[in-house]
Regions:
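Short amphipathic alpha-helix that is part of the acyltransferase structural core
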Residues: 1-54, 58-62, 158-165, 170-171
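Short acidic/glycine-enriched loop/turn segments that link adjacent beta-strands
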Residues: 49-51, 74-76, 141-146
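Conserved beta-strand in the GNAT
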Residues: 56, 61-71, 77-84
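Short, well-ordered beta-strand micro-motif
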Residues: 56-58, 148-152
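Conserved acetyl-CoA-binding loop-helix of GNAT-fold acetyltransferases
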Residues: 85, 91-105
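Conserved short alpha-helix immediately C-terminal to the canonical SAM/SAH-binding motif I
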Residues: 99, 123-126
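Conserved GNAT acetyl-CoA-binding A-motif
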Residues: 106-120
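Conserved catalytic-core motifs of GNAT/GCN5-like acyltransferases
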Residues: 118, 133-150
Length: 171
C-alpha cells in the first residue's frame, strides 16, 4: 500500500502500518467523535474495526487525521466512515480532502467499485466538491442528520450493476 504527500505540504497519508499508527488513529477518532462532537459516550469503536483498513494523515510524528474503510461485499462495495481530523489540522492543513481522496484511492486499489458513506449534513457540500453524490434522503445516524453518499472507484468493474446495490444506495 502506498503513501501519499499532497503537494506543498508535509502531510503524509498512509494505511496504518504499526501499533502506534493504529493507536493514534483511534485517539484522533476519540478526540473528534467522543470528546468534541459527543456523538459517542465512551468509544466510537465497533465490530467493523476488526477488519477495517485504518488510514492516517500525519504531520511528522503527529497523526492529525483518520478514516477507516472496509469491504461490504465481494463485488466491490466499500464503506468509508469515521473520518476525523483534529481541529487545528482542519484549519491549517485542510487535511480532510486529501484524507478522503486517499481513502477512495486505497479502496479502488483493493478492487473496490463503489464506496458509500453516511455524511453529516453540514459536510455534504464538501463531499460533493470531492465528486461524491447524494443517495436517498437525509436520515438520523448516531443522533445527527446524515446523508448517504456514494462515489465510483477507479478499479475493478462491479460484478453487479448498481441496481444490485439498491439496499446500499437507497434506491
Amino acid at each position: 500500500m502506498a503513501t501519499a504527500r499532497p503537494r506543498g505540504r508535509d502531510l503524509e497519508l498512509r494505511v496504518a502500518r504499526s501499533a502506534d499508527d493504529r493507536a493514534a488513529h483511534f485517539l484522533v477518532r476519540h478526540t473528534v467523535f467522543v470528546d468534541e462532537q459527543q456523538i459517542f459516550h465512551d468509544t466510537d469503536r465497533d465490530v467493523w474495526d476488526e477488519s477495517a483498513v485504518h488510514v492516517v494523515a500525519a504531520m511528522g510524528p503527529l497523526v492529525v487525521g483518520a478514516v477507516r474503510l472496509y469491504r461490504l461485499d465481494e463485488a466491490g462495495l466499500w464503506q468509508g466512515d469515521r473520518l476525523a481530523v483534529l481541529p487545528d489540522a482542519r484549519r491549517t492543513l485542510r487535511a480532510g480532502a486529501p484524507l478522503v481522496r486517499f481513502a477512495v484511492a486505497t479502496a479502488g486499489e483493493l478492487g473496490g467499485h463503489t464506496m458509500i458513506a453516511n455524511i453529516q449534513q453540514r459536510n455534504v457540500p464538501f463531499f460533493q466538491h470531492l465528486g461524491w453524490r447524494r443517495v436517498g434522503l437525509l436520515a438520523p445516524y448516531h443522533g445527527l442528520t446524515h446523508q448517504r453518499m456514494a462515489i465510483g472507484l477507479s478499479a475493478a468493474p462491479s460484478a453487479f450493476a448498481d441496481d444490485g446495490y439498491a439496499w446500499a444506495l437507497g434506491s
